[in-house]
Amino acid sequence: MQCALYDAGRCRSCQWITQSVNEQLSAKTADLHRLLAGLPVEQWCAPIGGPEQHFRNKAKMVVSGSVEKPLFGMLHRDGTPVDLCGCPLYPASFAPVFSALKPFIARAGLTPYNVARKRGELKYLLLTESQFDGGMMLRFVLRSETKLTQLRAALPWLRAQLPQLRVITANIQPVHMAIMEGETEIYLTDQQALAERFNDVPLWIRPQSFFQTNPTVASRLYATARDWVGQLPVRHMWDLFCGVGGFGLHCATPQMQLTGIEIAPEAIACAKQSAAELGLTRLHFQALDSTQFATAQGETPDLVLVNPPRRGIGKPLCDYLAQMAPRFIIYSSCNAQTMAQDIRHLPNYRIQRVQLFDMFPHTAHYEVLALLRRL
């Protein structure tokens, strides 16, 4: 992939950009083999890739500059701003949104936050696009609620320019730290969730719910999990760290009993909405800590699917799963190193199959799906 920002030395986020996609996949596959060395794997499935550019459905932009000439992008460690509107990872549909937002910021009087001076209001712009219908969610991350009245007053102009903006919010992040969002979310539109659809499964994206940033590869990840589960004798399943329910909603059948657990209430609200649309009455989603939920149960499901954050599921949950001994475990991971550590704490399981998904091209990161069978 050719990138003018990288060539000019202004951005180094895509550290592997000089390698071909095939070279990147080979290196990632070798890394996964290294991490799983000593763990018997019955089947290595071919890695899954996707587009090398224009694949991201989300932009996280630091806002700097002035209210008359705002700049969207990032700040180097020395405070130097870099305009990332031309980043080739973004789809072409983002460009008109960035173009309209620059004069809008002046109209609304949203002074960009100055990190050095600790002054200003607008810290970040967070933009998400649905691949289903092109609808978008825009979040203004503000230092305070001071400019809310001005923002509301100026919104009709912005919505006339950009009718694809279905969900608009103001997130309040008052802390002088590089934290992307605060706890308070104020909706500026009637619609509060963005509709998405993978493999004919309805999904919903809310402001504070995690959603994969590479829809093409994510849809194949979910479809693969569905295929694997469909080949197994599963009537009762847990989906831990379930997020908006992507895995569980794909894997569930009308006859299957499935419980999805996620600590974020916003994500659980999305999952429940999707389950209702699908008419799956035996799916139950709850906003709880996954480890605390699992260790408090007295029953053993046929299969436990885990999709933890980068830190992995941790030894306490590994120990409990080893003791509870479900027949199957599916582990989806964005950090193969912690996944390998966790699997080593499950000595009574063998990896039946494993597959790499190149969710993050031009970086060393990747997603992995592993099916474990009890010995």
From Swiss-Prot:
It catalyses: uridine(747) in 23S rRNA + S-adenosyl-L-methionine = 5-methyluridine(747) in 23S rRNA + S-adenosyl-L-homocysteine + H(+). S-adenosyl-L-methionine binds at Q212, F241, E262, N307. GO terms for molecular function: 4 iron, 4 sulfur cluster binding; iron ion binding; rRNA (uridine-C5-)-methyltransferase activity. It holds the Pfam family tRNA_U5-meth_tr. Keywords: 4Fe-4S, Iron, Iron-sulfur, Metal-binding, Methyltransferase, rRNA processing, S-adenosyl-L-methionine, Transferase. The active site is at C334. [4Fe-4S] cluster binds at C3, C11, C14, C87. Disulfide bonds: none annotated. The keyword Transferase applies. PROSITE patterns: SAM_MT_RNA_M5U, TRMA_1, TRMA_2. Its EC number is 2.1.1.189. GO terms for biological process: rRNA base methylation. InterPro entries: 23SrRNA_MeTrfase_RlmC, MeTrfase_TrmA_AS, MeTrfase_TrmA_CS, SAM-dependent_MTases_sf, U5_MeTrfase_fam. NCBIfam families: meth_trns_rumB. HAMAP family: 23SrRNA_methyltr_RlmC. Belongs to the class I-like SAM-binding methyltransferase superfamily. RNA M5U methyltransferase family. RlmC subfamily. Catalyzes the formation of 5-methyl-uridine at position 747 (m5U747) in 23S rRNA. This is 23S rRNA (uracil(747)-C(5))-methyltransferase RlmC. It comes from Salmonella enteritidis PT4 (strain P125109). The lineage of its organism: Bacteria, Pseudomonadati, Pseudomonadota, Gammaproteobacteria, Enterobacterales.
